[in-house]
Amino acid sequence: MTNIRKTHPLIKIINYSFIDLPTPSNISTWWNFGSLLGLCLTIQILTGLFLAMHYTSDTMTAFSSVTHICRDVNYGWLIRYMHANGASMFFICLFIHVGRGSYYGSYSYFETWNIGVILLFMVMATAFMGYVLPWGQMSFWGATVITNLLSAIPYIGTTLVEWIWGGFSVDKATLTRFFAFHFILPFIITALVTVHLLFLHETGSNNPSGLISDSDKIPFHPYYTIKDILGAFLLIMVLMTLVLFSPDLLGDPDNYTPANPLSTPPHIKPEWYFLFAYAILRSIPNKLGGVLALVFSILILMLFPLLHLAKQRSMMFRPLSQCMFWILVADLLTLTWIGGQPVEYPFTIIGQLASIMYFTIILLVLPTVNLIENKLLKW
């Protein structure tokens, strides 16, 4: 009798995606973060669903409904902080996942890479709208400042902002629609993740050497299922340590003050995972220029396949490119730090230099280094 997992219409899809999938034998721990992102998405959808059962998206009651969840709902505090810190874990995994793709040249799978960039945009949009929901001071002012950036778009800007707000300021209509979008987007993300995997399985996984690995493939199960389970345990351990010992470590104290349109917080800043983009936005004195730089700082990822001029795919055997890659990582960490600092000397100038460096390394330095390496290797 033929094995059911290979014949059943539904089970065979799972089989050829997670069980009998031929996988390169040498993929490292950096390849664990795809499955960890799946775990993060699952945690976020489940905790979010339970939070939505008790949350009310009304300006009068939103803040108190979150307080009610933390105080009166059974393990509400746990669900709320798992959701808030789960977002941080999600972004840590996302940044590592994108970094790994950049380092090992995974962007040469165009469709997989471009869908990944779209997914990154969607997760960022979802996280931004979720941050508005508790209706604290930073929620309100963050929403006001970021949505207001669209007014920089010539001609239609102001109309567009008022259309998104549903009025002349961030108010009840804005909160209600943000809740609706925050609820639906993760399911759209899940659908896109399926497409992301579909395209990945068309080509098979990349590996650290960047070489074709068809001659040396092993089944995904049990080798990589056990490896992914270990990664999942470690992620849950880090998340629960954060949730149970210092749940507010990555949050903003201002968000424990109910939203007040009449009082602006001294320093408006987003969550830590947006700070690098926020620093780039603030580095440009012109409003429209800042918005374009902000969007392009993420959109630039789509240019990676075009900017790859090296004859080798991976950076594994290219020490000069490795050096530039880690300088870029250090630059992004600098931007993250600057994004959380007030707009004053010396932070402004450091931010401007780091922003120029970010775009220069990606658009100019890395492609040039690629050509130098080709020359050195006599290719």
Swiss-Prot record:
GO BP annotation list: mitochondrial electron transport, ubiquinol to cytochrome c
Tell me the cofactors it needs.
heme b
Alphabetized GO MF terms? metal ion binding; ubiquinol-cytochrome-c reductase activity
> Mitochondrion: present as a keyword of the record?
yes
Record's cofactor remark: Binds 2 heme b groups non-covalently.
Which InterPro entries does its entry note? Cyt_b/b6_C (IPR005798), Cyt_b/b6_C_sf (IPR036150), Cyt_b/b6_N (IPR005797), Cytb/b6-like_sf (IPR027387), Cytochrome_b (IPR030689), Cytochrome_b_C_euk/bac (IPR048260), Cytochrome_b_N_euk/bac (IPR048259), Di-haem_cyt_TM (IPR016174)
Q: Which Pfam families match?
A: Cytochrom_B_C (PF00032), Cytochrome_B (PF00033)
The topology of this chain with respect to the membrane is: Multi-pass membrane protein
Q: Which UniProt keywords apply?
A: Electron transport, Heme, Iron, Membrane, Metal-binding, Mitochondrion, Mitochondrion inner membrane, Respiratory chain, Transmembrane, Transmembrane helix, Transport, Ubiquinone
Q: Which family does it belong to?
A: Belongs to the cytochrome b family.
Quaternary assembly: The cytochrome bc1 complex contains 11 subunits: 3 respiratory subunits (MT-CYB, CYC1 and UQCRFS1), 2 core proteins (UQCRC1 and UQCRC2) and 6 low-molecular weight proteins (UQCRH/QCR6, UQCRB/QCR7, UQCRQ/QCR8, UQCR10/QCR9, UQCR11/QCR10 and a cleavage product of UQCRFS1). This cytochrome bc1 complex then forms a dimer.
Extra facts: Heme 1 (or BL or b562) is low-potential and absorbs at about 562 nm, and heme 2 (or BH or b566) is high-potential and absorbs at about 566 nm.
Protein name per its UniProtKB record? Cytochrome b
Give the classification, highest ranks. Answer: Eukaryota, Metazoa, Chordata, Craniata, Vertebrata
